[in-house]
Every structure is written in C-alpha cells, then in structure tokens.
Amino acid sequence: MARVKRGVTAHAKHKKVLEQAKGFYGRRKNTIRTAKAAVDKAGQYAYRDRKVRKRAFRSLWIQRINAGARVEGFTYSQFIHGLDVAGIVIDRKVLSDIAGQDPVAFKAIADKVRAALAA
C-alpha cells in the first residue's frame, strides 16, 4: 500500500484555522499553534457570551419597564403582578419597547393594571 503524505490536508486545516484567526493581534494571526489556541478560546467566549447576551437584554428590558412603571406609581414587581392579575400576556421585550417609545400606550396598560389590582 502506498504511503499517504498529508501535505494537502494539513495545509487545508492550517489555512482554515488561520482564516478564523484573521484580525487577531501579533503571532495569534499567523502562527498556527498560537492561532489554534486563540481560535479555540474565541469559540469558548462566543459560546458563553451568546448565553450572557440573553441575560443582559432581559436585564435591560426589566430596567426600562421598571422606569416606566415608577412613572405610573408602581414598582416593577407590583406592575408585573398586576399584569398577571389583569390577564395581560405581553413579553418583557415588547413591554420595554412600549414603555420607551409609546408612553400613552404604556399609561393605558398601567391603568388596566391599576384597575385589576384595585378589584
């Protein structure tokens, strides 16, 4: 059986890693050993931070809802409880957008919450 030389395969693998490392600083962009480590670490950060981004946006939405709710005389938790009691099903992303972009609509929602909590 003939000997298989891996020059083409190895070159392709190295090229793939170096393309992923494009834009990195120093030897990380052009030395295969450091580039491979840097690309692996970048992948770990990317995986982790895709989860963190979801948390961060939810936190931002809650802050915006809280600000809008306090203008209407509620705390965030009172407002969310009131939405539940009133039977209003709306997610935090949309609610924060309403609070920031359309104060009149948010006031209407707050009035329904106030009525539901009073009843």
From Swiss-Prot:
Gene3D superfamilies: 6.10.160.10, Ribosomal protein L20. GO terms for molecular function: rRNA binding; structural constituent of ribosome. SUPFAM superfamilies: Ribosomal protein L20. GO terms for cellular component: ribonucleoprotein complex; ribosome. Keywords: Ribonucleoprotein, Ribosomal protein, RNA-binding, rRNA-binding. Pfam families: Ribosomal_L20. InterPro entries: Ribosomal_bL20, RIBOSOMAL_L20_CS, Ribosomal_protein_bL20_C. CDD domains: Ribosomal_L20. The keyword Membrane does not apply. GO terms for biological process: ribosomal large subunit assembly; translation. The keyword RNA-binding applies. NCBIfam families: rplT_bact. Binds directly to 23S ribosomal RNA and is necessary for the in vitro assembly process of the 50S ribosomal subunit. It is not involved in the protein synthesizing functions of that subunit. Belongs to the bacterial ribosomal protein bL20 family. This is Large ribosomal subunit protein bL20.
